[in-house]
Amino acid sequence: MELNGPPSSQVPHTPTCAPSLPITVAGTLLRGPQLLLRAAEKYPRTPKCARCRNHGVVSALKGHKRYCRWKDCMCAKCTLIAERQRVMAAQVALRRQQAQEENEARELQLLYGTAEGLALAAANGILPPRPAYEVFGSLCGEGGTDSKIQKFDLFPKSLIPRSMTPQLPSGGKPGSPDSEPVSGSAPGASSPEAQPGSGSENGDGESLLSSPISKELKEGEESPSLISPLSSESGSDAEKDEQDPSSSSLARQRTPINILTRVFPAQKRSVLELVLQGCGGDVVQAIEQILNNRSQDKGEGTWSKDGALQSIQPSVSSTHRPLIAGALTPAIGTIGSRSAFSPLQPNAAHFGTEANTYQLGGHIGLNPLRLAYSAHSRGLAFMAPYSTAGFMPTLGFRPPMDYAFSDLMRDRANVHKDQVYTNGLYGPVVNNNAEKQ
């Protein structure tokens, strides 16, 4: 069989492409480079400037905030963006603070345990304070009615506001016969009726009547003359106002002169008024002055107005004690009787007076050193706290204005120095000059 065509060996091979064969191209050749692809993927997710977006411009936010064209724009959209940014910044700061506090609280719990760690965190301000039943629920749940009953006895009623304390009935007074069994009970325990229902109004009222402050008020209403100085001074005005609704009568009794008359019923009212005036209206200071006078011996002599303050000649008496802070002490010659804390004192002969003399009249026989450095600056002017017992009742002193230092020097200048300093205090030079005159 013959073939009509040339042999295959003689047919020239021409490079022809078969149309049925598919062409395969690698996918990496159709994509861009790896660097360009990464930039193309992340650029749409980079933060953009919101102000520029409001005005139709797209700009990356990194390094753009300072150079933004619309950073000071006050339009409605930009103002809303600024407010939203402020709120978001506050929320982020709060979340950071809460996360830090939680981490610190977690560390404290690991160190000290759960309850102690939360307590320390709340005490240091790391955690906001929670109610007691959340942290110490087991401790608070153990307390029963006994702790509630003791609550009314341990804490005074003056610490509880007036709105929380129940008002007493109008007919029942602290001094009425109905309240006598209650007041007769012990101060530290409430009445038997108040124990079963400690939270009721009856328990509050009876425990209020059984407090020591109300008992003092009841005794004060029955016998005001038998009140001691301690009981009259104890209890502030606020506590008495809380206990007794009739504050007008107590206000009249709390005046300084009334307090002094109740504390010292044996003293005259005029004397107490004068002492109070000299102390500048200070009740405590006036009581100290009177108590210091009463602590001396009752047998000592009293000073009269003419003999003590206005005598020109020196009056010698060994029974009197110094009324002036600048006066000399009695046993000045004996070293053993002097105190180690007493200041150095010159000889009494330089002043022409004895150790216990008082010249408060025309020329005043005072020690200038002791007068200048007075040890007692409170109370009456130049008055020592160790005055005689009869000094106050006899009114043996001048008004406080006469004790000014300028008046003392003025009275002293009216008298010649030879009458006061008989032994030549300032040496022969001054005395010779005086003799020449």
From Swiss-Prot:
Pfam families: DM, DMA, DMRT5_DMB. It comes from the Eukaryota. The keyword DNA-binding applies. Residues 179-201, 223-235 have a biased composition (Low complexity). It is found in: Nucleus. CDD domains: CUE_DMA_DMRTA2. Belongs to the DMRT family. The keyword Nucleus applies. This is Doublesex- and mab-3-related transcription factor A2. Residues 160-253 are annotated as: Disordered. GO terms for molecular function: DNA-binding transcription factor activity, RNA polymerase II-specific; metal ion binding; RNA polymerase II cis-regulatory region sequence-specific DNA binding. Residues 49-96 bind DNA. InterPro entries: DM_DNA-bd, DM_DNA-bd_sf, DMA, DMRT, DMRT5_1_DMB_dom, UBA-like_sf. SUPFAM superfamilies: Cysteine-rich DNA binding domain, (DM domain), UBA-like. Keywords: DNA-binding, Metal-binding, Nucleus, Zinc. PROSITE patterns: DM_1, DM_2. It comes from Xenopus laevis. GO terms for biological process: germ cell development; neurogenesis; regulation of transcription by RNA polymerase II; sex differentiation.
